[in-house]
Amino acid sequence: LAWNTDIDLLWLGKGARPQSIGLDFSRNISSELEIHGEWAHQYAAGKNTLESSGSTVLSTANPDSYLLGARYLTEHEVTWIVEYLHNGRGYSTSELDSYYAFINSAVNAGETTAQLQKARKLMQSGYNKANSGENYFYLRASVNEPFDWLYTTPALTVISHLDDGSFQFTPEISYTGFSNTELRARAILLSREQRTEFGEKLSRQRFRINTHNFYFIS
């Protein structure tokens, strides 16, 4: 704790992941407003990139990633969270566009087995990970027990890839009226633009109902 701010310093030794250093902080500006952030620096981080010729190149760099955000609680019990994320290891829009074009070509009828295998390897090498781009915006609003709905919390979440304009929109509702159990229903709706991160997902919309059980040992 320094200057009324919670600060953590982090270090990760080299292993399955590159050696990294970082820090995070959180500070309450008032009883309603909190700001937070994270920063990470990686050493000799590998990155597979698809060239325009169709070949794959492995490069190393020392990328920086960071997050800045704020949380605000209104007098009506609405919690707003807004965040900006920069992924230093992410792919540019031109790199992602080349990848999407290759994948779309590889899955067309008549493509060779070698091309399909290469497409699968690319998907596993980093292109298909969550937040594979460079810049993102996150917004979430949740309301605690609106209209006197006891144990109920509805929420809306938007995640946008700022560089290609695609987004994910997630309305959800949770209920905790049962002992040690939470029920959560969620819809995941994606933008439809082709050759964008969220537009290229396998499913354009998904609906899920989850049950979480909690057990406390005294």
Residue ranges and their predicted role:
Residues 1-3, 27, 72-74, 143-145, ...:
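Residue-level signature of outer-membrane beta-barrel architecture
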Residues 11-21, 131-135, 158-170:
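Solvent-exposed loop/turn segments connecting transmembrane beta-strands
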Residues 137-141, 204-218:
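Outer-membrane beta-barrel "beta-signal"
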Residues 24-26, 38, 69-71, 140-142, ...:
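Outer-membrane beta-barrel architecture
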Residues 19-24, 47-54, 92-99, 156, ...:
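Outer-membrane beta-barrel translocator domains and adjoining extracellular loop/strand segments
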Residues 11, 51-57, 123-128, 157-159, ...:
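Extracellular loop and loop/strand-boundary signature of outer-membrane beta-barrel proteins
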Residues 11-15, 41-45, 84-90, 143-147, ...:
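Transmembrane beta-strands of outer-membrane beta-barrel pores
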Residues 2-9, 32-36, 77-80, 147-154, ...:
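Repeated loop/turn-to-beta-strand initiation elements of outer-membrane beta-barrel proteins
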